[in-house]
A protein has these predicted regions:
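Conserved nucleotide-cofactor-binding alpha/beta core module
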Residues: 1-94
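Substrate-binding/catalytic lobe of Class I Rossmann-like enzymes that use SAM or dcSAM, i.e.
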Residues: 83-117
């Protein structure tokens, strides 16, 4: 199977491509795109891994999950981090707490501020 890696940093893509070639990892494709958008052109995906903490999973990424697909990430809520698994079952997304942990917040994944009365 092909592994699609999304990165917004061109230098990191270049570095990663060199490492993949040196290690004969021929099934990896690196794509420059905003992380929070994912890459719907090749979806739906059976597995999505967001490596870093986020404050919310954007719907645009959840919509890229195939039926039976899973997304794993670290969700930060109120200064507390949790490894979470999101699964698409019967066209609904179900979340499951895995364990507590912290990681740096990924750029572009801050929760959008909402107006409150």
């Amino acid at each position: 199977e092909t592994v699609i890696c999304i990165e917004q940093d061109s230098e990191l893509i270049d570095f990663s491509e060199k490492i993949a070639i040196q290690n004969s990892m021929n099934n990896i494709v690196f794509i420059k795109n905003e992380l929070k958008k994912g890459y719907p052109d090749q979806g739906p995906y059976s597995c999505i891994l967001i490596e870093g903490a986020i404050e919310e999973v954007p719907d645009v990424i959840l919509n890229q999950l195939a039926e039976g697909g899973r997304l794993v990430t670290i969700l930060n809520k109120d200064e507390n981090g949790a490894a979470m698994k999101f699964s698409r079952i019967n066209n609904e997304v179900i979340s499951q707490f895995l364990f507590s942990m912290d990681a740096p917040l990924l750029e572009g994944f801050k929760k959008s501020k909402k107006f409150k009365f």
